[in-house]
Amino acid sequence: MIILRFLVLFILLCSLGNAQQRKMGLDSIDKNKVSLNYLFYLPESYQVDENIDWPLVLFLHGMGERGNDLELVKVHGIPKIVDTKRDFPFIAVSPQCPMDYVWRDQEMLEALESLLIKIIKNYRVDKSRIYVTGLSMGGRGTWAIVAHRPDLFAAAAPICGGGDPKTASKLITVPFWVFQGALDTVHYPKESEVMIQSLKKVGGEVRYTLYPELHHDSWTITYDNPDLYKWFLSNKNN
């Protein structure tokens, strides 16, 4: 039997100052032959009212954060935001891709699906408000996981990473907001724009933000923008 181990990092923000409480836990499910560690964040108010279900955002990091050191995952994106923002209004799940994989691999897509299902079963997740975002390799993974399970997601925000245009017809039920640096030479704007054009051709809903003066790092300005999170919350999966 192959065990897929999930290392859970519970982050509960303190009510005073900027201090944080962190609880470590270990869990496992039977799935693929990968070991998937992840950071897990519950909103400060999660324990206050047990009748409230919370939106969830899945964050997929880039190529440089792969491995088995969760500290790397905290460097960019959603984990960086929740480390500094006391009132982040989402359950946040930030897995770490093993070194020998990329998010688009079928094994990883199935592992991510299992992870989300597990979180949904064990926490008060609003199943109509599950979102996914990622940067670079994680941007590519964002397109891929939505194509893999479009029914799970209410909206998606890939940053500086394209997808497979042949999957466009699978994406039409999910609104996309795509972000890209115009001067990016790691993942050229064309990668994102091909996906946008393919999605529009099949009737998908997509908006595009192109930063004219940015190179590959188009994620810092994006994740610092409150409008991204407002847009997430404006979309529900019926």
What is each PLM-predicted segment?
Residues L4-S15:
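Sec-dependent N-terminal signal peptides
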